[in-house]
């Protein structure tokens, strides 16, 4: 017998819950033993839900995008990049000015409650990933008496997300460099048969103990002035440093992707060819067909409206804040920061914005999951939210790399999730699951995960669906 709808959100902000369920709804259902009706929804302004369009059609959008590289590489003039973003912001605001004040997270939380009511349910069951945890935290504190079973997986700090943008970037990326170091160390431990970069004779750098991570960092620096050629594409082209850095950064989200990105770097370093790196970036888009062609940005409106930017009112002060964040995460802060720079010019005030409190007494306890090696939603954020919720949330520590618990799944955490949703078992304070396999050496890859029989491949597919929905932003 169904326990009712389980609403899911992949994050972003701007991720499509519809695409997520379309791609992996069967796996989500299997993870909860089929006891819930899995419901994905596109939040306001996203996907099939009154998409915010800045251009007339996809052709016009692509023509505009062709005028610049979406990723700012070191050495690029930020003023030129900012001018492009300002032009885009002006266009988007002009075309959507009447609707934009109503796309805040608080507005979407009210929509979730309307969905609950439409399904005839007394309580809301919800599973949110990444930014979806901010949406979930907002909902459970706006509607605490309607909280059923709610899991927030890959928690972003709600106090910084709703605060100054650059500070949120800085505090979100505190483990990104740790992930790069682990990528290198585990590659070396796995050896050349499992990791193409595990060859000290071809290393570009050595720090006295390791060579893979130093090689990757040095190579990314060399690409600033030496872009890669594409040799096997239908048309000639190059891959610039910002794109390669972005490909590597995205690989940190899912440990199962590490062998593939290592092979791409090995090819590029040895032959100065960027085809595998280019293919890594475009693979997710060519393998799937979204229900709605997204002609514009989808994450910028929510990101800029939910936060405050008083300390970064202009490009100069924003770049200073980004420079401080880059001391914590030299690679990722620049990638995130230049993508989010548009908030400087996003002059839209939300009709409603929720910034706390975060300690409302919820009808049921919320499960908060944080992965110890998460590159963008640090485990500390889940622990902090547990404190902020003052007994209404329980933090479960998932020892693993990658983004959210799906970045490097374990039988233990899958069982915690299943037991919470299906049997209503809330883990004890201090709940923790150990890492069950090592990067590049997935001993669990041929095993099923828990009583529900989920396979490692199914969980990998689910992670791809979540990350695909996020990457459309």
Language-model segments: residues:
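Acidic catalytic loop of the alpha/beta-hydrolase fold
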Residues: 252-257, 373-376
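Gly/Pro-rich cap/lid or specificity-loop segments adjacent to the active site
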Residues: 1-243, 301-473
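Long, low-complexity segments enriched in small/aliphatic residues
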Residues: 277, 282-307
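Solenoid-repeat scaffolds in large eukaryotic assemblies
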Residues: 260-261, 273, 277
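Short edge-strand/loop segments of extracellular domains
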Residues: 267-272
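Generic hydrophobic alpha-helical segments
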Residues: 264-265, 417
């Amino acid at each position: 017998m169904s326990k009712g709808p389980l609403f899911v959100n992949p994050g972003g902000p701007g991720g499509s819950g519809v695409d997520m369920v379309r791609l992996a709804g069967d796996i989500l259902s299997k993870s909860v033993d089929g006891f819930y009706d899995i419901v994905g929804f596109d939040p306001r302004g996203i996907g099939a839900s009154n998409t915010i369009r800045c251009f007339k059609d996809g052709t016009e959008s692509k023509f505009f995008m062709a005028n610049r590289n979406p990723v700012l590489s070191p050495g690029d003039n930020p003023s030129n990049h900012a001018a492009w973003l300002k032009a885009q912001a002006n266009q988007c605001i002009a075309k959507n000015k009447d609707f934009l004040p109503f796309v805040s997270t608080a507005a979407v939380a009210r929509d979730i409650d309307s969905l609950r009511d439409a399904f005839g349910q007394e309580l809301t069951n919800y599973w949110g990933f990444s930014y979806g945890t901010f949406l979930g935290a907002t909902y459970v504190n706006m509607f605490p008496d309607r909280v059923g079973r709610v899991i927030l997986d890959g928690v972003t700090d709600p106090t910084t997300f709703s605060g100054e943008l650059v500070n949120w970037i800085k505090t979100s990326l505190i483990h990104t460099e740790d992930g790069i170091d682990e990528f290198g160390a585990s590659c070396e431990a796995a050896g050349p048969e499992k990791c193409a970069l595990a060859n000290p004779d071809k290393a570009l750098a050595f720090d006295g103990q390791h060579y893979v991570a130093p090689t990757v960092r040095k190579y990314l620096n060399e690409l600033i002035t030496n872009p890669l050629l594409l040799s096997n594409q239908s048309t000639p082209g190059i891959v610039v440093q910002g794109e390669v850095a972005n490909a590597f950064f995205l690989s940190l989200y899912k440990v199962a992707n590490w062998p593939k990105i290592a092979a791409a770097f090995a090819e590029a370093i040895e032959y100065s060819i960027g085809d595998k790196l280019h293919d890594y970036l475009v693979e997710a888009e060519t393998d799937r067909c979204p229900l709605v062609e997204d002609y514009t940005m989808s994450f910028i409106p929510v990101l800029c409206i939910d936060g405050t930017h008083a300390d970064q009112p202009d490009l100069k002060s924003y770049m200073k804040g980004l420079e401080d964040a880059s001391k914590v995460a030299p690679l990722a802060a620049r990638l995130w920061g230049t993508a989010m720079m548009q908030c400087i010019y996003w002059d839209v005030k939300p009709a409603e914005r929720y910034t706390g409190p975060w300690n409302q007494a919820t009808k049921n306890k919320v499960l908060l999951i944080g992965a110890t090696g998460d590159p963008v939603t640090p485990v500390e954020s889940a622990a902090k939210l547990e404190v902020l919720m003052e007994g209404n949330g329980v933090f479960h520590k998932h020892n693993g790399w990658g983004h959210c618990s799906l970045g490097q799944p374990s039988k233990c955490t899958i069982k915690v999730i299943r037991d919470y949703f299906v049997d209503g078992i809330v883990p004890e304070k201090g709940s923790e699951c150990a890492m069950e396999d090592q990067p590049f050496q997935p001993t669990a890859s041929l095993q099923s995960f828990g009583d529900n029989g989920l396979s490692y491949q199914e969980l990998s597919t689910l992670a791809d669906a979540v990350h695909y929905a996020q990457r459309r932003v």
